[in-house]
Amino acid sequence: MPRVDPNLRNRARRPRARRGGGGGVGSNSSRHSGKCRRQRRALSTPPLTFLATTTTTTMMGVASTDDDSLLLKTPDELDKHSGSPQTILTLTDKHDIRQPRVHRGTYHLIQLHLDLRPEELRDPFQILLSTPLQLGEANGESQTAPATSQEEETAASHEPEKKKEKEEKKEEEDEDDRNDDRERGILCVVSNEDSDVRPAFSLFPARPGCHILRSVIDQQLTRMAIVRLSLNLFALRIITPLLKRLPLRRKAAHHTALHDCLALHLPELTFEPTLDINNVTENAASVADTAESTDADLTPTLTVRVRHALCWHRVEGGISGPRGLTSRISARLSETTAKTLGPSVFGRLELDPNESPPDLTLSSLTLYQDGILRFNVTCDRTEAPADPVAFRLRLRRETVRRPFFSDAPLPYFVPPRSGAADEGLEVRVPYELTLKNSHTLRIYRRFYGPYLGVFVPHNRQGLKMPVTVWLPRSWLELTVLVSDENGATFPRDALLGRLYFISSKHTLNRGCLSAMTHQVKSTLHSRSTSHSPSQQQLSVLGASIALEDLLPMRLASPETEPQDCKLTENTTEKTSPVTLAMVCGDL
């Protein structure tokens, strides 16, 4: 079995470089750094230019806690000696400008380790992957065998039928599910714990193109002989929360400043077949008509029909919900109806295209102890809509496999614009805010589900905000650090950052759940579990994720033929290069 280059292994365990322009770091490290300098001087290219296309790759299997077992292996050797897929790809500054090597494979983690001179960080440079990169399917890896010509012809003949069935299914689903692709992948770049350079914690959509990774350079680094840049690149599973449906909240007493604009009679409680939105296989009417249908197959559904002239009140938005014109409607339910609804009930609006404002949203939904159902509908406009207003409120018991909010996400959380490259919700300030000192912003929304919310700030001049992990069943609290003596002002609807919901399996540890973007570190470690005696995990921001629970990343050679890089619906759209470029600046 081939052994790793001893110089490379010594460098992996090297101590920190001593400060000073010519300070050594030990005999082995000094020889290695001198060798690197001689290699760089031998190249006739400008500084750092070779990094754009000549970053070489070295394959590495699952790391072990024993240093002697950290052997660099080729893909063939990994497949020969181990039946498990390749897990970690390690990129180092070992390179050959004349014959850059690009390896194919599927990995859960890509590590980059570069030893640079401080002066090499002055100019922007490309650091990672000039090769097609795509993500595996969120609900299963995309490593499938190539289809034969006969299979392709068969699939093509059935494609119109599948397309028609898919359109029929979409008609049965509500808007939340039509606009959602279920789990998707997003690339995450974070520095390793032994990195001297501090790149910002960054999330990038897995789309072709070059993404900018920004970093700060401490002045102390200029006095070091060798500066280490160490990065971890991996793909997180993300999922879009429910935005058009609200959970039915239950309260004992009614306290509100708004009066009921409309009081309805008792709606009829109907029973409808249970439909699995993730896998709709049968028509609802056909299921309801079958004699085999039982109470377990039927879901209680309450439909409140409204076609009436409503009175409207103006609200500014915030804790009470979205801003705009709001109308409150009530309906008294019988005790039997209220009990039959049971828990896990969600409500959504079904609009009439001719008599409903297109921007009408459900902003609150509450059932009180006295059996009165009250809900608010809101439209963001200055003038009241024309009368009458027609819509239906449908309450249904559902098993939700996505994050959902305690109240309407607006005006705090705004979905991305159609066609936007970024997948995260925009977090905005609902009103003008002026801060003189550092302040903690509390957003009065909770979310539910076995997920993690991650807030990535959009820092403005004169203030900074940390990357924050948002735990379920808690308010989202954001710390704003004001560095300008004159304070800082947030105009109305100012962008604070973006919010992502991580669906990768995770465990919480004692790490800090909040850190500035340039202070976020990641650690690769082993942990014993009931399923595996030594499971590789990656820890970042107080959460640990097993490598096998990360979305696999597939690398392909640039000369790969198009038919060998076919993509599924849940992968990137094109097999174009996904690259990262680093821009460094002073702290």
Swiss-Prot record:
Annotated Basic and acidic residues bias: 155-169
Organism domain of life: Viruses
General function of this protein: Plays an essential role in viral DNA replication. May participate in the DNA replication initiation by interacting with the origin of lytic replication, oriLyt and subsequently recruiting other viral/cellular factors. Additionally, interacts with and shuttles IRS1 viral mRNA from the host nucleus to the cytoplasm.
Protein localization: Host nucleus; Host cytoplasm
Organism encoding this protein: Human cytomegalovirus (strain Merlin) (HHV-5)
Family: Belongs to the HHV-5 UL84 protein family.
Region feature (Disordered): 1-48, 136-185
Biased composition (Basic residues): 10-19, 32-41
Motif (Nuclear localization signal): 161-170
GO cellular component, one term: viral tegument
Keywords: Host cytoplasm, Host nucleus
Identification of the protein by name: Protein UL84
Main location: host cell
Motif (Nuclear export signal 2 (NES 2)): 360-367
Subunit composition and interactions: Interacts with the DNA polymerase accessory subunit UL44. Interacts with HCMV major transcription-activating enzyme IE2. Interacts with host HNRNPK.
Span(s) of short sequence motif Nuclear export signal 1 (NES 1): 229-238
Biased composition (Polar residues): 140-149
Record Pfam families: Cytomega_UL84 (PF06284)
